[in-house]
């Protein structure tokens, strides 16, 4: 969705040892199927879900049967298309915030279960109601809904940015999604880049 951190998400995944690629929101269904991903991450972005002409995915993610992680705008997008509610915040939240895990979730490794952690926020909209059947898993200093999930369908949403170094345990959260939830194998290294270019 055009976040300044999008490439950083891909980098974090590759650091784990898993191949990842960045594609635009308007990728065609045909191109999407050709990639055949094991999971997708919906990035943040500068747009607002509350606008009438907001940025949307061309692919209907509600029909996908693979794990989904929404970050920032990606979280708000999931809330919106599944029938939740997103509202404009009175003040933009940017910078450090305290996030508290209030429900267990596969996206949060056991070592951080129930903890309060420092996270990095960058958003002006907020989810005020989660969709039916989804459950709130975390809250922050300025929001009662900072993460939610639909565990049985492997759909997860985070308002904060786990990909930036300012978020404590961010790499662990991304790894939990990639390895434990998407079941990806660590088969990619920088040597793959050299082999592809040669």
Report each predicted region and the residues it spans.
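RNA-binding accessory domains that recognize and position tRNA/RNA substrates
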Residues: 1-42, 46-52, 56, 62-64, ...
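Gly/Ala-rich beta-loop-alpha elbow adjacent to hydrolase catalytic centers
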Residues: 70, 74, 79
């Amino acid at each position: 969705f055009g976040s300044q951190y999008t490439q950083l998400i891909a980098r974090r995944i590759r650091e784990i040892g898993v191949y990842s690629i960045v594609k635009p929101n308007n990728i065609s269904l045909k191109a999407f199927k050709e990639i055949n991903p094991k999971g997708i991450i919906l990035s943040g972005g500068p747009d607002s879900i509350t606008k009438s002409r907001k940025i949307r995915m061309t692919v209907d993610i509600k029909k996908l049967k693979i794990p989904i992680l929404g970050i920032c705008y990606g979280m708000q997008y999931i809330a919106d298309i599944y029938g939740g509610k997103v509202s404009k915040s009175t003040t933009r939240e940017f910078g450090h915030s305290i996030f508290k895990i209030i429900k267990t979730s596969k996206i949060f490794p056991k070592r951080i279960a129930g903890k309060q952690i420092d996270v990095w926020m960058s958003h002006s909209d907020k989810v005020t109601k989660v969709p039916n059947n989804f459950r709130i898993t975390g809250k922050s200093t300025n929001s009662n809904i900072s993460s939610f999930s639909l565990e049985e369908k492997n759909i997860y949403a985070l308002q904060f940015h786990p990909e930036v170094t300012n978020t404590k345990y961010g790499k662990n959260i991304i790894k939990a999604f990639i390895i434990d939830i998407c079941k990806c194998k660590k088969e990619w290294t920088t040597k793959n880049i050299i082999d592809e270019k040669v």
